[in-house]
């Protein structure tokens, strides 16, 4: 369906386009977490070395720019996904009323909306990196976003390539942007990549875990249409598979926290994440498809908690709290 079923009016069209970007739902806000966490951790590390080197306001400003950049890029990516998958979405119960799948938004309208969001995200990245070359960061991320919907096709399952791989990469990659927003003038790109590797792996594994649980909601319709997704690896052992995936980010967290070695981060990351993920696996019921959506939501709350924890750590480093006790 590529044409509008009816003219919704300017306000109605705006609401539909916002829905196409998912800005009216919590999902896009996952994509800001890698960049924001990386910005805050990089800022906290710099304050640990020299509390006078940066202001808290500057670090939060950079984190805010990263948030807007990632949100806009995610909106463009979601619009692209719905453009490519509109015929598939029309046959899946959970997605059949999406604006493109239902014909309420035309292909041309969606394309214009997508390009506008992408352009604004590029301009925002230019601000974040203080007019440095941005395409070295932007092009790999753009390629992964464009590739993502095609990996749902069954041909990729034959070589064990699943869309969650690319989604995890796309969500994790902006951690490089976040680190560069603080250290871009002082560190080479190879140094930035090295510093960001632990947090990139953490976000990648985390995304693989919660998105596999989320996509399991559509398993009945997906099997009918032979849609490729990571949960097919597990078969009937989906709980065991999710437990394995949930253990992967927990294994990486120490390498992230050790950079600062803050007691607060050890508690707010390692302890809270461990309890949360264990509880999620215990509550998961493979016979109730909606329980995968509950895991997705629980991890969003976990991500918000981690963002707040990182902001608190920036404040603790600024006042040299750990030197006072």
From Swiss-Prot:
BP GO terms, sorted: mycophenolic acid biosynthetic process; terpenoid biosynthetic process
Give the InterPro entries listed for this entry: Prenyltransferase, UbiA_prenyltransferase, UbiA_prenylTrfase_CS, UbiA_sf
- Pathway connected to this protein: Secondary metabolite biosynthesis; terpenoid biosynthesis
The phenotype of cells or organisms lacking this gene is: Results in dramatic reduction in MPA production and leads to the accumulation of DHMP.
Cellular compartments per GO CC? Golgi apparatus; Golgi membrane; plasma membrane
UniProtKB keywords: Glycoprotein, Golgi apparatus, Membrane, Transferase, Transmembrane, Transmembrane helix
TM stretches of this protein? 27-47, 56-76, 108-128, 134-151, 159-179, 192-212, 240-260, 262-282, 295-315
Please give the coiled-coil regions recorded for this protein. Answer: none
Q: Where in the cell is it found?
A: Golgi apparatus membrane
Topological type in the membrane: Multi-pass membrane protein
**Gene Ontology molecular function terms on file:** prenyltransferase activity
| Cofactors that this protein relies on | Mg(2+)
Recorded catalytic activity of this chain's protein: 5,7-dihydroxy-4-methylphthalide + (2E,6E)-farnesyl diphosphate = 4-farnesyl-3,5-dihydroxy-6-methylphthalide + diphosphate
Query: What domain of life is recorded for the organism?
Result: Eukaryota
Q: What Pfam families does the database record attribute to this sequence? A: UbiA
Enzyme Commission number(s): 2.5.1.-
Q: Which residues are glycosylated?
A: 131
Query: What functional role does this protein have?
Result: Polyprenyl transferase; part of the gene cluster that mediates the biosynthesis of mycophenolic acid (MPA), the first isolated antibiotic natural product in the world obtained from a culture of Penicillium brevicompactum in 1893. MpaA is a Golgi apparatus-associated enzyme that catalyzes the prenylation of 5,7-dihydroxy-4,6-dimethylphthalide (DHMP) to yield farnesyl-DHMP (FDHMP). The first step of the pathway is the synthesis of 5-methylorsellinic acid (5MOA) by the cytosolic polyketide synthase mpaC.
Write down what this protein is called. Answer: Polyprenyl transferase mpaA
Organismal lineage = Eukaryota, Fungi, Dikarya, Ascomycota, Pezizomycotina
Its gene name is mpaA
């Amino acid at each position: 369906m590529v044409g509008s079923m009816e003219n919704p009016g300017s306000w109605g069209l705006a609401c539909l386009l916002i829905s196409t970007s998912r800005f009216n739902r919590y999902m896009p806000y996952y994509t800001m977490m890698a960049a924001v966490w990386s910005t805050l951790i990089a800022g906290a590390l710099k304050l640990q070395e020299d509390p006078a080197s940066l202001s808290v306001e500057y670090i939060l400003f950079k984190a805010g720019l990263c948030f807007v950049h990632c949100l806009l890029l995610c909106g463009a990516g979601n619009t692209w996904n719905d453009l490519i998958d509109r015929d598939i979405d029309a046959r899946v119960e959970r997605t059949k009323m999406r604006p493109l799948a239902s014909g309420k938004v035309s292909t041309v309208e969606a394309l214009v909306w997508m390009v506008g969001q992408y352009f604004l995200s590029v301009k925002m990245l230019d601000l974040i990196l203080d007019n440095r070359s941005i395409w070295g960061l932007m092009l790999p991320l753009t390629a992964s976003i464009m590739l993502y919907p095609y990996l749902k096709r069954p041909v990729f399952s034959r070589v064990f390539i699943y869309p969650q791989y690319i989604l995890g990469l796309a969500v994790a990659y902006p951690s490089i942007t976040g680190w560069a927003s603080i250290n871009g003038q002082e560190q080479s790109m190879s140094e930035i990549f090295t510093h960001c590797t632990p947090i990139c792996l953490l976000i990648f594994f985390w995304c693989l875990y919660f998105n596999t649980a989320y996509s399991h909601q559509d398993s009945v319709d997906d099997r009918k249409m032979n849609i490729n997704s990571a949960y097919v690896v597990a078969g009937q052992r989906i709980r065991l598979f999710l437990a394995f995936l949930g253990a992967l980010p927990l294994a990486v967290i120490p390498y992230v926290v050790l950079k600062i070695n803050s007691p607060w981060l050890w508690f707010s990351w390692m302890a809270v994440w461990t309890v949360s993920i264990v509880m999620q696996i215990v509550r998961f019921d493979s016979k109730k498809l909606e329980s995968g959506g509950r895991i997705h939501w629980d991890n969003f709350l976990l991500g918000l908690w981690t963002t707040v924890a990182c902001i608190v750590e920036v404040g603790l480093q600024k006042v040299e709290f750990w030197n006072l006790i």
